[in-house]
């Protein structure tokens, strides 16, 4: 048994303008080559674009989009007796949010468009409405888990 103490789970800090943890999680995922100020610029521009498009609170649109994309269940590759099975596992809320943010950013990067702020705002608005690539990715993951339900006992 280990003598070391258990590490305390870190909580996500909130961003300086909106005081929102989700915004900060988005900033940290969009970050490339340590350019955090550029990541903040992209997020804040996309939030302004969401405000212009929907004429509602952009943070509620962001919350709704992330809630819509967050998966409840995922599949994990598990090797049993020489063959690899896709085993469905339940996902916690923190891990689900992280996956949702990753999928949203991936879908926005794939979109055709002018700049990242425009693409991200479009993807967030679509996800809040229940369409878009990120929502499709969630549904595909749920379908995979449902198809491999027979292997659930391999956890």
Curated annotation (Swiss-Prot):
Cellular component GO terms, alphabetically? chloroplast; ribosome; small ribosomal subunit
Q: What does this protein do?
A: One of the primary rRNA binding proteins, it binds directly to 16S rRNA where it nucleates assembly of the head domain of the 30S subunit.
Fetch the InterPro entries from UniProt.
Ribosomal_uS7, Ribosomal_uS7_bac/org-type, Ribosomal_uS7_CS, Ribosomal_uS7_dom, Ribosomal_uS7_dom_sf
Which CDD domains does this one have? uS7_Chloroplast (cd14871)
Which cell locations does it reside in? Plastid, Chloroplast
The name of this protein is Small ribosomal subunit protein uS7cz/uS7cy
Q: Please, which domain of life does this record's source organism belong to?
A: Eukaryota
Primary subcellular site in the record, as a coarse category: plastid
In the record, what terms sit under GO molecular function?
Answer: mRNA binding; rRNA binding; structural constituent of ribosome
Q: Which PANTHER family match?
A: RIBOSOMAL PROTEIN S7
Please report a single Pfam family linked to this protein: Ribosomal_S7
Query: Which family does the record claim for this protein?
Result: Belongs to the universal ribosomal protein uS7 family.
Q: In Gene Ontology terms, what is a biological process of this protein?
A: translation
- Native organism: Vitis vinifera
Give the UniProt keywords, A-Z. Answer: Chloroplast, Plastid, Ribonucleoprotein, Ribosomal protein, RNA-binding, rRNA-binding
Under the subunit heading, UniProt states: Part of the 30S ribosomal subunit.
């Amino acid at each position: 048994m280990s003598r070391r103490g258990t590490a305390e789970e870190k909580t996500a800090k909130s961003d300086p303008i909106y005081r929102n943890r989700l915004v900060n999680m988005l900033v940290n995922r969009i970050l490339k080559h340590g350019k955090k100020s550029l990541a903040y610029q992209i997020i804040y521009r996309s939030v302004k674009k969401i405000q212009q498009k929907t004429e509602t609170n952009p943070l509620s649109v962001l919350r709704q989009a992330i809630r819509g994309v967050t998966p409840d269940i995922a599949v994990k590759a598990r090797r049993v007796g020489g063959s690899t099975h896709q085993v469905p596992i339940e996902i916690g809320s923190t891990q689900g949010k992280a996956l949702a943010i990753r999928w949203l950013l991936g879908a926005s990067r794939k979109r055709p468009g002018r700049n990242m702020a425009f693409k991200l705002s479009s993807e967030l608005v679509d996800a809040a409405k229940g369409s878009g690539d990120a929502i499709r990715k969630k549904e595909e993951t749920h379908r995979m888990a449902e198809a491999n339900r027979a292997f659930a006992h391999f956890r």
